[in-house]
Amino acid sequence: MPKASEVKKGTAIDFNGRVLVVKDIVRSVPQGRAGGSLYRMRLYDVVTGSKVDETFKDSDMLTLADLTRREAMLSYIDGDEYVFMDNEDYTPYNLSKDAISEEILFVNEETQGVHVIVIDGAPVGLDLPSSVELVVEETDPSIKGASASARSKPARMSTGLNISVPEHISTGDRIRINTAEHKFMGRAEK
């Protein structure tokens, strides 16, 4: 049983009889001497799909839910359903667009290292690698000699993700992106 301060994004907890996956954590420190940090967590109910906001003290003990992570790749999109195929036993996992709306911006058919989070045999979310490689679909033309400057410009990836990239990056370039911070890391190695 970890403390609330030890829980990370993507962790599944058992809270009030429901299995919830942590989507986002905001830490705040109240004014005054008394009390420790507060952790406001945006949680996703794996059964109903509803979003729940809860606040925990840093010392609150939370119960982890029983979950497994299965390595998988995006196989195809069927309307608002994304179908991932297990890399070991080829089991298909269907996830709704709403359940993985943030994560799907980093995933295409070539993305390696994606894990489907499975609770009680049902897929409930995605666990992304720390970085992914995507192709720049649209950006302003690159400027010759711009690699020495620190200016950036907006770019849209093939998945629809929008990030800032250095001026020397052009349309069609393959780049590495940090999935936690939504930031450009560098050109992908060929």
From Swiss-Prot:
PROSITE patterns: EFP. One of its GO terms (molecular function) is translation elongation factor activity. GO terms for biological process: peptide biosynthetic process. One of its GO terms (cellular component) is cytoplasm. Belongs to the elongation factor P family. This is Elongation factor P-like protein. It comes from Pseudoalteromonas translucida (strain TAC 125).
